[in-house]
Curated annotation (Swiss-Prot):
Component of the chloroplast large ribosomal subunit (LSU). Mature 70S chloroplast ribosomes of higher plants consist of a small (30S) and a large (50S) subunit. The 30S small subunit contains 1 molecule of ribosomal RNA (16S rRNA) and 24 different proteins. The 50S large subunit contains 3 rRNA molecules (23S, 5S and 4.5S rRNA) and 33 different proteins. Residues 1-91 form a transit peptide. The lineage of its organism: Eukaryota, Viridiplantae, Streptophyta, Embryophyta, Tracheophyta. This is Large ribosomal subunit protein bL34c. Disulfide bonds: none annotated. It is found in: Plastid, Chloroplast. Belongs to the bacterial ribosomal protein bL34 family. The keyword rRNA-binding applies. One of its GO terms (molecular function) is structural constituent of ribosome.
Length: 152
């Protein structure tokens, strides 16, 4: 069974020469592994250390599948502080530059129409469910260019 026994972060011994470091000790069954990582002036890109450890399948227990550590070393001496930029999705108002918000029936029919529903297995299953429910209109977004609903 793999366990994390020691996790420490520290700085160098000299006050003038401060180097961020991390020390990890892993105990896997009968073996103990010590790992020590330190950052020098330009060797690292960010101020955070990301370690991940996955135990081998021979010592893998059912209740331990892996360990992922993210250490944020606050000392920024000689280390650039690039932040991870994440894409944030927000539900908000429509942009001011968009004047036409509605789409034409033809473009809606291309993505939600009867012919598209019939071309896929899940679409045919959807049509089958709507028929069983008794819906008169199977696909509401179909472009009525021909048939009963066509305008003269």
């Amino acid at each position: 069974m793999a366990t994390l026994s020691l996790l420490s972060t520290g700085v160098g011994a000299a006050i003038t020469n401060r180097t961020p470091s991390a020390s990890l000790t892993f105990i896997t069954g009968s073996r103990t592994t010590n790992k020590r990582v330190s950052f020098n002036g330009g060797s690292a890109r960010s101020g955070s250390l990301h370690c991940s450890f996955l135990a081998p399948s021979s010592s893998l227990s059912s209740n331990f599948s892996g360990l992922s550590l993210g250490l944020d070393l606050t000392s920024n001496t000689g280390v650039s502080t690039d932040r991870c930029r994440r894409f944030v999705v927000r539900a908000g108002k429509a942009a001011l530059c968009l004047t036409k918000r509605s789409r034409s029936r033809k473009s809606l029919a291309r993505t939600h129409g009867f012919r598209l529903r019939m071309s896929t297995t899940s679409g045919r299953a959807l049509l089958k469910r709507r028929r069983a429910k008794g819906r008169k209109i199977l696909c509401t977004k179909t472009n009525p260019s021909s048939g009963k609903r066509a305008s003269p």
